[in-house]
Amino acid sequence: LTAHYFMKQGLNCVLVEKNQIAHQSTAASTAILQYEIDLGLNRLMSMVGEQNAQHAFLFGYQAVMEMSQIVKEINSNCDFTFKPCFLYTQDPRKVDYMADECKSRQAIGIHCELFTSETHQNEFSFNFEVGVYSHYGAAIINPVQFTRDLIEYNVKKGVQVFENTNIVDYNLSSRQSVLITEQEFTITADKVIICTGYDALEWFKHEKPFYTLSRSFAVLTKPVENFHGWKEACIIRDDQDPYTYIRPTLSNSIIIGGEDLEIDDLDGEVANMGDRHPLALQQYHQLLRRVRRMFPQIENIKTDCWFHGLFVDTKDGLPFIGKHPDYPGAYFNLGYGSNGMLYSLIGAKLISQDVAGKNPKELEIFKFNRY
């Protein structure tokens, strides 16, 4: 996405990938495109200020629409489909909180409404007390196909792409930077944009951690015959911490994710567990039991596959986008949090504008030293 936006700005760029394109976290993504931010709008306003929080939510809301435009532009066959989304609670003490949250979102132009158990319980087979049902601002996508189509489109537009190319050394400068590959080739650039997700944490080992790490789990079911008890097969998320999310696929399967485990030690068991680790299996089975309980009218919910991955989160649920004082000549586009794909799009847009000399003031919202 960053290379795409640089190309759109008329900037000459080279894309370098240590592994294979569309592997690693892209292949493991559940690919929920949703404007939702973990803290919710009201809590985020109390942390970063009313204007910044509103802008952050609207950025995500608009990014879903912008992603659909990119899909059309590159003619991608990636199953992009708009979906409504439902954030709910089963806690009766949170009725007023959810009502206020819904009003705050409506006030900035988000098309949502408050669902209560009295008005809409018959549209869902699981119990809830109250929830915010958003009619727009969410979608599902095939991330691997989208990435492949995006790369192919940009290569045709002149972007150079090198995969299986590991950068092992660098000399960053505000004037010109040099990157050195494992094969001892050099790349000279006016600006370097680091978009390496979890791997980018290596750049900040000397700092006090500004993030938290966890391992998140997901189960993909085999196709089911229907989505009874599931209004519009919307994207569903509860208000727990960690939360559980559920989405359909276009092949009538279900993806359920959550049951996150915190990582306190990078050398510990949770940080390095394999796919068949007993604790991982426990989390998968818990997710499967949960989706069966929530949708008793959907018969024969069976596992097709499961997977887990590392998840990087931030204190306010927002990404880190922009410059860092320790690395002149570089920008970071780090979509940490629950909206990795949308945050990456937002970062790509803002950074490309900044490099092109347009100085977008919105970068202030996502800067490194904001807390």
Protein language model regions, located:
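Short beta-strand to alpha-helix junction loop
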Residues: 58-61, 88-97, 133-153, 162, ...
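Flavin-dependent oxidoreductases
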Residues: 169-255
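Central beta-strand plus flanking loop segment that forms part of the substrate or channel wall
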Residues: 30-33, 38, 83-88, 208-232, ...
